[in-house]
Amino acid sequence: MPKLKSHRGAAKRFRKTASGAIKRRGAYRNHILTKKSTKQKRHLRVEAGTLKPCDARLAERMLHGS
C-alpha cells in the first residue's frame, strides 16, 4: 500500500510545534496593505496562535504525511 499523502493546502497553512500544538498564520496580512493604517498593520503583527482542540484534530489528520 502506498504512503499517505499530506493535504497540500493544510501543509502550507499549519505548522506543528515541538509540544504538539498546531500553529496558524493570521489573516489580512498578505496583500492590499497600502490602504490599511500603520496601527492596523501593527496590531496584525501579533502571532495568530494555535488552533482549538477540535480544529487541531482535523488539521492533524490532514498533516499525517508531513
UniProtKB/Swiss-Prot annotation:
Pfam families: Ribosomal_L35p. It comes from the Bacteria. Keywords: Ribonucleoprotein, Ribosomal protein. Gene3D superfamilies: 4.10.410.60. GO terms for molecular function: structural constituent of ribosome. Residues 1-48 are annotated as: Disordered. InterPro entries: Ribosomal_bL35, Ribosomal_bL35-like, Ribosomal_bL35_CS, Ribosomal_bL35_sf. SUPFAM superfamilies: L35p-like (SSF143034). Residues 1-44 have a biased composition (Basic residues). One of its GO terms (cellular component) is cytosolic large ribosomal subunit. One of its GO terms (biological process) is translation. The keyword Transmembrane does not apply. Belongs to the bacterial ribosomal protein bL35 family. This is Large ribosomal subunit protein bL35. The gene is rpmI.
